[in-house]
Amino acid sequence: MENENLQPTEKKETTKEKKKLPKWANITITVGVCLTCCGAGVAAGIILSNFLSFNSTDYGALNIEDYEDDLDKLVTKYKKTDSHKYLSTFTPYELATIARYNVTQHTYVKSVGIGLVNAAMGVKQTVRSYYLKSDNQYFFESISKSKIVGVNKRFYQDETQVTIYTGRGSDPEKATWKEEDKTSVSIPEYEETWGRELSRCTNFIISSKTTLLDQSSATQDGNNIVLSLELDPLTSVLRYVKNMKAMSDLDDYPTFHKVHIDMTLDENLNVISTKTNEVYDVKSFGVTSKNTSGSLEETYTYDQKEDFPNLTTDCDYTKGE
């Protein structure tokens, strides 16, 4: 959601005591609405006039692996459980983890995300995300725009590397992509910088150690199961904050106040839809925006092959609305 090449212009000092400020007194803020089950974080930039103090969070003192559960053990239990007993056998976070695992088991997966960010000064920014899985290759597009700035990113992952394109244009649902506007990194390098590779089906850590059980639930709705997950705003975002910082070239990692995810699963524990809501503080260009809120709604389809868009092909977001 940001223009990474944006350089604020300066106005002349009117007095000796007055410091130089950017012409707009602005910052580019990462808005982190993220794909809950399949995707990379959808980060974006917002122009804000909001000078506030920033309390940074030392995520480096926390080890990601310490907050993740044993997936193999859970999957083994899941495969031995009768489908009519899912709700009584598994906790909300276990159901979410199984559903995310099931996403990875489909050869073809598609997720379309439609979101909105609300920030200080009444600034609003649209969010679009498009994710495709085709066997062991992955595509992800993130487009987010306000009236002033936006960010356009495409990611293509194969067996060995991730190729990242930075697009141009102001349209809220498409961009111009050029071959010269790309970088390629190995998958380990990408995961180190961005928090997770595209084959990992979420940026968030949803586990026994990151889920607030007294504020989470799983209920039956016809043949579906509806999950309401309140996550710890510190430990659940250890991967996610890397993505936000890399996407928007932030001064520091954002500090989260709230992470809530609603998920609807079918009777086979496939994800039908998700809605993510977040509140956080973020700092860029030395300026802080507090209590930025964002939401993203995603819909999922499976087992329908769709070719990855080339640089002249736009993603179709109409089916996600």
Each predicted region: which residue ranges?
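Short, hydrophobic/aromatic-rich segments at coil-to-beta transitions
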Residues: 104-112, 137-139, 221-228, 246, ...
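N-terminal leader/targeting segments and the immediate start of mature chains
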Residues: 2, 6-128, 312-321
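An acidic-aromatic
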Residues: 123-195
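Gly/Pro-enriched, hydrophobic low-complexity segments
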Residues: 225-315
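Beta-turn initiation residues at beta-strand->coil junctions
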Residues: 113-118, 142-147, 165-168, 275-282
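Buried hydrophobic residues that stabilize the cores of well-folded domains
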Residues: 52-59, 154, 162-165, 271-276, ...
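Flexible, processing/modification-adjacent segments and terminal tails
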Residues: 163-224, 229-230, 234, 238
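Short amphipathic beta-strand and strand-loop transition segments with alternating hydrophobic
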Residues: 129-130, 208-220, 262, 303-306
